[in-house]
Amino acid sequence: SDTTITTKQDTSGGIHVAGGGTLTASNLTVETNGESSAAIRSDRGGGTMTINGGTYTSKGTGSPAVYCTADITVSDAALSAENSEAVCIEGLNSLSLKNCTLSRNIPENEQNDCDSTVILYQSMSGDSEVGESNFSMEGGSLTSLNGGLFYTTNTESSFYLKHVDITYSPSNDFFLKCTGNANKRGWGESGKNGADCTFTADEQEMSGSILWD
């Protein structure tokens, strides 16, 4: 708790859980600068993370504020990704945000088939068990500086929003995109890699398109 963590190299996350581990953190100041370096991250075998308070910023390409292959709960924290999706959840895992600020700016990348703020997916890399991905956000704010908001592909997924103050990008490409993909990283077999999505909004204002196939 009450600690500053700064990383500068690629694949150097801020705080990390894997192999079924448990991590509890409070009031950290975390900044990562390399590629594939999420401020809050997990890896194979998952685990549990409980985070209360603090600031978590990722600045590198492909470095979300939260990369989730575990069960992660974050409350009363500021989360920001400057060159990536803000949140990536893969496979049978969950992220719960309560009274957090979440923002992101993602540059265009030819490997991506769309630009989103929160993505729930299955990469088939083996980093996570296949199953339903869960994202919930209550209170706080969500800011998108470009592209769309919520994207899910090649997985079962569920979203829950309540009382979130949303700032949309100027283009507001989509509110929710629930489709297959032709991603160059190989997220399932094209034509067979759609998403089965449940989206629940509770006393939530929303605007934008819903795309599905």
Per-region residue spans from a language model:
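Surface-exposed loop/turn motifs in large extracellular/passenger domains
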Residues: S1-T7, V17-E35, R41-S84, I89-E110, ...
